[in-house]
Curated annotation (Swiss-Prot):
Localization per Swiss-Prot or TrEMBL: Virion membrane; Host apical cell membrane
Superkingdom of origin: Viruses
Record-annotated site: Cleavage: R342, G343
Organism: Influenza A virus (strain A/Starling/Victoria/5156/1985 H7N7)
Protein name: Hemagglutinin
Glycosylation site list: N30, N46, N249, N424, N496
Amino acid sequence: MNTQILILTLVAAIHTNADKICLGHHAVSNGTKVNTLTERGVEVVNATETVERRTIPRICTKGKKAIDLGQCGLLGIITGPPQCDQFLEFTADLIIERREGNDVCYPGKFVNEEALRQILRESGGINKETTGFTYSGIRTNGVTSACRRSGSSFYAEMKWLLSNTDNAAFPQMTKSYKNTRNEPALIVWGIHHSGSATEQTKLYGSGNKLITVGSSNYQQSFVPSPGARPQVNGQSGRIDFHWLILNPNDTVTFSFNGAFVAPDRVSFFKGKSMGIQSEVPVDTNCEGECYHNGGTITSNLPFQNVNSRAVGKCPRYVKQKSLLLATGMKNVPEIPKKREKRGLFGAIAGFIENGWEGLVDGWYGFRHQNAQGEGTAADYKSTQSAIDQITGKLNRLIEKTNQQFELIDNEFTEVEKQIGNVINWTRDSITEVWSYNADLLVAMENQHTIDLTDSEMNKLYERVRRQLRENAEEDCTGCFEIFHKCDDDCMASIRNNTYDHSTYREEAMQNRVKIDPVKLSSGYKDVILWFSLGASCFLLLAIAMGLVFMCVKNGNMRCTICI
């Protein structure tokens, strides 16, 4: 019997660690959560607050011509009660009103006062010109104990016209003023309502009193209403102040027969200014452009949550206390367990798995290993490209939201309360709209930032893949296994986009042939082992059956079947 010995040899190819280059992005252990159009609470590496919540509790006036009215009410600068004597003419770009300020001395009110306040706040200061009115047959020196200087006096810019003697008839008079300047003029006059009919007769004589005022675009008649009223400043009478803006070359005419408080000077405005009502102190050592009743907002942010009635060059008021603007890429913190399990390249390519917390000098970068060791380097080109597109996002938001705000008070007269309610409702509605708009604007910018940074990562990955071509193989974790020896200079050429794949092509192709093209991962090893075992058993069984068949054929073995 011929004996044949068959030897089955199992050859295992062991692949040593190849040179590798991996791509990844910067990550931090604790990022900042922002909202995007599609998702809330997305963690990013960097974010900037866009809502200002801080304020300086002072009115900063450095570099400004500021005027603090103190006890003088804003409207008093036109009529001239004693407390406003030093403010009858001035120049300012910031007018500060105080709660203690009073517009009048003899009790009364300004008609349509809110509109007049707004005009004066924007005036930039005032200079004045005499009306040139002259009178005969009457007294022009009416005074009252309610307006005291060294003794009884009156409004500095007005003339209280009285009968020549008590109870004497007041003559019918007509006075006109023509505005000869090339700018509008503000004219104020008063209607005196006596405390009683007896007092009116004493001051202006008997009979009905009528005052008529007219210009090219204004016509109004006034009838005084004498009567008992509660005393204010020792007076039961009242003066209603009326006003009009007289255009250049226009003329206003006053016709009256008593109870008339005549203008002595008219007012002209100087440039532009801003007014603020506040009780906080003035600080000449700090600068500001945005003011509210609690102080100054000094911020370059596009939004603020300090005061809805801030005035000046202010951030938009929104209800949100925080709106974070992403200024960095999406953060996927490095996972320590993966790093321990897979070594240097365990936490590779953040756009696939997670980021690199050690990559601090760039947003994107490379890690490599070769015979000379391991290394990490930032990719400045892709980093700068992303930064260039993100830089200026805050400024663009500011450009979209910046607006000069003006103060509109809630101190409306009875006649103006409905207008005041409309203004307040409108202000609240605008706040609601801008709060929504701010949320949407920031979410859109955040979405764009995250998409942009992902795009730059993909561009870098594609750049490397196109360079290496068949000289390397992707491993689906952001790494490329290189099939040739790649020293530090070679790695640098890949990073710098100067790699020449043809130089290494022959070596790479030879090495690819030696390497089993099927890369076994732990998930497939058991399947291959069972397949190998089954194939070996089948081969042994086939050999045994072949030997039996040969023996039977040669007569060396007989098979008897019994039935």
